[in-house]
Amino acid sequence: LGLSTVGCKKSNENNKIKEGQSISSEEKGTSTNKKDKNTTFKPSDYTLKTKKEYVYEYLGLKFKLSNKFKKYMDDKKIAMLDDQSPINKELKYAFLTFNKMTKEQKKAVVNKKEGGYEKWENGLKRIGTIGIFEKNTSEEKISKMTKCDTHTKIGVSSDEKYDCYFSTNSGSEIKLLNEFKKTEIQIIEKK
């Protein structure tokens, strides 16, 4: 049995988002309210934040990134994002992506309509991913989904339905790739 809480708080520090804070769709720039006047947002402000350790029970994984890699994330040189199969169906895959951000991508403000976010995300250079894929998913399919060309099987999920992979893009900047490879990953009970 797990219990979690999320708090909402508005900050006066340039409205920066704090860890654990809930973000409204208007703040994120994804509001469906037709009267909403905000038509743009800055995607780099909504990347996943650094933590001492990442625990994803629904993936059955926990991992620690190197301090240097976390510094790259804090400096917005790397964007950590998530991706998963449609939530209204049985889970087929779920993974976290680590992507190099240029100065332009870090500062970019995109239109929330017209596919602005998708264009921004597709322009990022993939370093690697950590995730799970339904058992017997081909490496060719994993490569297509993750935009990576090297896949290391970490193991099998505790429920034995998923293979866990650490994937990398050999074309990535070598110093970023080497730091990413220092990630410590552990399979835990999937909930």
Show which residues each predicted segment covers.
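Secretory pathway targeting signatures of secreted, lumenal, and periplasmic proteins
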Residues: 59-127
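Short, surface-exposed beta-strand/loop micro-motifs that present aromatic residues
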Residues: 142-158
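N-terminal, intrinsically disordered, polar/charged segments of Gram-positive cell-envelope systems
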Residues: 10-65
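C-terminal motif of bacterial Sec signal peptides marking the signal peptidase cleavage site
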Residues: 4-7
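Short, flexible beta-strand-to-coil junctions
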Residues: 84, 99-101, 133-136, 167-172
